[in-house]
Structures are given as structure tokens and as C-alpha cells.
């Protein structure tokens, strides 16, 4: 392809002037149309190469998530999964896997679309996982799903529920879901549309995707990031962490169809639910790092110390 910059254009005009002085009128017109076509093609190609909008998740995520500069998102190197949202948005994942990992941990953000700080923390933690502190006693295969509910995150304004109006954190197949989920929604929430559990368990592609991840990845621990209650919740076996950073343990109970109930109580996989203090603003970078280091230490001490926690093929 031919590209014209200013010096080239000046040279071309000088050459054209010389040709005009020494050519017939027909030749001059032919030269004119040829030059105009070349310049037009060059301009179009330059726009495609330089000015065309970029694609990929970071274009939208860096605009919608707090404290997520484009460089932070790009460095995470999110990979497309086979999962899609109701509206066909790709569900992006990132695996950070050392050699011979001892444990597998699944970290999920933005189950609720109006809690974008949860996705932002997950993206920052990918960068910390890639740094892999040398003093960590356990090596962990991390799988991140930073935005489980992209339709909710990208809605204007962001919405807790997915595009079908379902609260994904009430859509998991806990025992007696058919009996309990709708009754809880009607009696305890007053039919709050932001907490509708859906028509049946796993009715939504996003909750189906996460359940499939649990079945195939077989995590030893699930970390679910939410906001804005500013506490830690825990469900399942093992001793819960007393704190992560400035967040202290305050177990909130279980709900029909919740991830904590399904994973921690029903499936026996420890589920740490992090409730950040603000849904629209992340903690300071130093605080996010401290939360991460505390999570590493607790994971090594409590999850890694459990009998039978040996590497398994995912």
C-alpha cells in the first residue's frame, strides 16, 4: 500500500508540475486522476490503521469500571470464553497458572452489574497474581471471571440484575430452590424486582456458565466480590478469614439460590464473599494489595492445609 506524508506530497506536486509542462492535455488529465485516487486511498488506509476504534473488552470496561485505566485492563490479557450473556456479550476469563499448582481458586466479580468496583478489584488482582510473590508458601492456579454480568455493568445506568431481570446471585440450584426462592423473594423482599431469582434455577446463561466453571475447574476455593456492605462473609467448610485488609468477618447468613449457599453449603467448596465498602469506588491501590496478601496467607494456611488438597487435573 502507498502512504503519503507531507514531504512526499510536496515532492509529488513538484513532479506533477513538471509533467504538466511537458505533457499533452490527455496525459495531464490521466495523471491528475491517478494522483487523486492514490491520495484518497492513502487517506482511507491511514484512517483504518490509525483512527479506527479498537475492539476487545477493555474498550468498554476501562470506561465503565472505577480506577481501571486502560493499561490495567490490557495488562490483564483477558481471554474470551465460550460463555455469553443474555445479550450475547462475551464472558471473559483469565487463568494465572504456575508450574505444579497446589490449589485452584476461582475469583468472580460483578455478579451484580451495579457493583462495578467488584470487577475493578478483580482486574487489579490479576496483575498481583501475575507478580506471584516468592514468599507465598502455596502455588495457586487462579481463574478470574472479573465481569460475570456484563449486560448489567454496561446498562445505562448499571443494573444489579441481568438483561432478563434476574438476580444471578439467587439463581443457583440450591436444595429446595423451587420451594424457597420464590417464597423468600415474595415474603422477605416484597417482590423487589432487583432480587427476582428467576423462573427456575440456572435459567440464565451467566449462572449456567459459572456453574459449569465450578464443575470443570473444580476450585478448592471460590472468592465472590460484591459491594457495598464493607464486610467479609463466608460459607462452607474450613475456618473463615477473620479479615482481609480493613474488611472484618461478619457472616450475613445464606439465601436461597445464592452462590455462597450453593458452593459453600451444598457443594462443600469454601466461598469467601467480599463486600467492598463502596460499589462505585475501589479501595486504594495499597488496600487492594493488602487484601490480596491477606487472602494469599489465609488460603495457604487454611485451604492448603486441608487433607487431600493435592493437584488434580482440571
Residue ranges and their predicted role:
Residues 4-20, 37-40:
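Short, low-complexity, charge-dense intrinsically disordered segments
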Residues 47-91:
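Short glycine- and acidic-rich boundary segments immediately preceding or forming the N-terminal edge
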Residues 79, 93, 144, 222, ...:
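Conserved beta-strand scaffold positions in the cores of enzyme catalytic domains, especially
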Residues 93-101:
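Short beta-strand-to-loop junctions in surface cap/lid or active-site-entrance loops
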Residues 102, 106, 116-251:
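Active-site/substrate-binding loop(s) of hydrolase catalytic cores
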Residues 231-235, 241-245, 257-314:
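Active-site-adjacent mobile loop/cap segments within catalytic or ligand-binding domains
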